[in-house]
Regions:
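Structural core segment of the AMP-binding/adenylate-forming
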Residues: 74, 102-170
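Conserved AMP-binding/adenylate-forming core of the ANL superfamily
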Residues: 38-97, 114-119, 166-167, 181, ...
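Conserved ATP-binding/catalytic segment of the ANL
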Residues: 23, 74, 85, 374-378, ...
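Conserved pre-ATP/AMP-binding loop-to-beta segment of ANL
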Residues: 22, 37-40, 160, 173-192, ...
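Conserved AMP-binding/adenylation subdomain of ANL enzymes
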Residues: 211-228, 236-277, 285, 291
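Gly/Ser/Thr-rich phosphate-binding loop
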Residues: 275-279, 289-351, 364, 371
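Single conserved hydrophobic/aromatic residue that forms the stacking wall/gate
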Residues: 444-463
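N-lobe entry segment of adenylate-forming
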Residues: 1-55, 59-74, 78, 147-154
């Protein structure tokens, strides 16, 4: 790949139809089952906090069809929104595919939500249904739900992952309800952003955008059919429910999600299941390295690591590579881009694999200053995104806007640089930009010397 503009921080590429997955989630899981019915799609093993399962693609395809019919049979209609609330339970993924087949919308809910957060999240999208884990944080979820459901007028259908879904599966298997036609451009998933600049924003994402971003990231990482990939991303997050879940189905690989991250348990999974890839946050790798059993482990099957969620220093990436004896790559993405938008090439040197990397196929990027002008190479500015993974917009902004600029570019809010080859490095948030004498200054660039000198505390004064 060659950067179209060698001087300006701009990567503009045409969208090739071959880079877009114009299918629905239901079509994705069904096609995987048709091609490889007996390959394991989802495995939970060596995790004492959750039941052990080994679901094939055929099982997941058939069960999601039954559950979709069960949901429609109890009164939900295509277009209704259903919340999913809980940790990384296997039934979460089954529910995700079932909701997609039923033409329902899915709003993912953080298991750390308390009463007011849950009320806000469900009322904002006028949720008709809620599917939840039996216990969340060691507390029966039904206790909280019973206290708040009266404050959510639209909510009429509530089921737990265990007993509730089992009955819906039985009902659906006996039903002759015809599943609706679903379009790949229909909005399917709604996720709330962190809300660091105000109230949480409801990002709306289509089937097509979700699958396209997930598949293209896995192609870049060279994930293969039947490859075992363990990951530590929460399913309520875009990294878990989209990138890892839909990427695995796209490549027909085996997904091994962590129910709750525990370093020793994660090492058990990687070792006993012979996982060849682990994807998670830098803190996951650090915790595993510090586990007392780490040096005794046989991790010879593990060949590659992908980290996301932060921008680790090159030195730390090298430590990961040496400790696990595996290739390590960083990646950059966000909810609004349906997951990954940049990651390095497998052939890149370590210093390039430590930064955000190159745009995925079909993704265009710009780095602009406070006047919306494209900056020169290696100058910091706000990163703008345009591409097939872009959300349809926020669904709850007070002014009714989508959050996407009129020219189709989405302002990520992230501060970045782009080099002459198109590689992106995230250096902060745009609100941290300091403008001095017309020059954009990043706080990371200003504070970097203190890190190199191991200075713990410093005060910076700019004149």
């Amino acid at each position: 790949m060659t950067k179209p503009n060698k001087e300006l921080s701009e990567w503009i590429v045409p969208i090739d139809e071959s880079d877009i997955s114009s299918i629905t989630l239901g079509e994705l899981i069904d096609s995987a089952a048709d091609e490889f019915p007996d390959i394991e799609a989802l495995v939970y093993s060596n995790q004492p906090d959750v039941k052990e399962i080994r679901w094939t693609y055929k099982f997941l395809s058939d069960a999601s069809t039954d559950l979709a019919r069960g949901l429609l049979g109890e009164g939900l209609s295509p277009g209704d929104t259903v919340g999913v609330w809980g940790p990384n339970h296997p039934e979460w993924i089954l529910t995700e595919y079932a909701l997609a087949k039923a033409g329902l919308k899915m709003v993912t809910l953080n298991p750390l939500y308390k009463d007011q957060e849950l009320i806000f999240a469900l009322n904002t999208v006028k949720a008709k249904g809620l599917i939840h884990a039996d216990n969340i944080g060691g507390i029966p979820a039904s206790d909280l739900i019973n206290t708040i459901k009266g404050e959510i007028p639209s909510l009429h259908h509530i089921h737990s992952f265990d007993k509730g879904l089992n009955q819906l599966l039985v009902n659906g298997a006996q039903s002759s309800i015809q599943l609706p036609a679903v379009n790949s451009k229909d909005i399917f998933m709604i996720q709330y952003t962190s809300g660091t600049t105000g109230m949480p924003k409801a990002a709306q994402m289509t089937h097509e955008a979700l699958i396209t971003s997930a598949k293209n990231s896995h192609i870049r990482w060279k994930v293969t059919n039947n490859q075992k990939v363990c990951h530590g991303f929460p399913l309520f997050h875009i990294g878990g429910s989209a990138c890892m879940t839909l990427g695995a189905a796209s490549m027909r690989s085996v997904s091994l999600p962590l129910y709750i991250f525990k370093p020793g348990v994660t090492l058990d999974i990687i070792e006993n299941e012979s996982c060849s890839m682990f994807i998670g946050a830098p803190v996951h790798l650090t915790a595993m390295m510090q586990d007392p059993s780490f040096q005794k482990r046989d991790l010879s099957a593990l060949k590659s690591l992908v980290v996301g969620g932060s921008n680790p220093p090159v030195e730390l990436m090298k430590q990961f590579s040496e400790a696990f004896d595996a290739d390590v790559t960083n990646g950059y993405g966000m909810t609004e881009t349906c997951g990954l938008s940049c990651t390095a090439l497998p052939t890149d040197p370590p210093e390039l694999k430590a930064i955000a990397g190159l745009p995925l196929p079909g993704v265009s990027l710009r780095v602009v200053d406070h006047n919306y002008q494209i900056v020169m190479n290696d100058m910091p500015g706000e990163l703008l995104y345009k591409g097939p993974g872009l959300m349809n917009g926020y669904g709850n902004l007070p002014d009714g806007s989508s959050g996407i600029n009129d020219d189709g570019w989405f302002p990520t809010g992230d501060l970045a640089t782009m080099n002459s080859e198109g590689y992106i490095n995230i250096v902060g948030r745009s609100k941290e930009m300091i403008i001095r004498g017309g020059e954009n200054l990043s706080l990371i660039h200003i504070s970097e010397p203190t890190r190199l000198l191991s200075i713990s505390y410093a005060v910076f004064c700019l004149k």
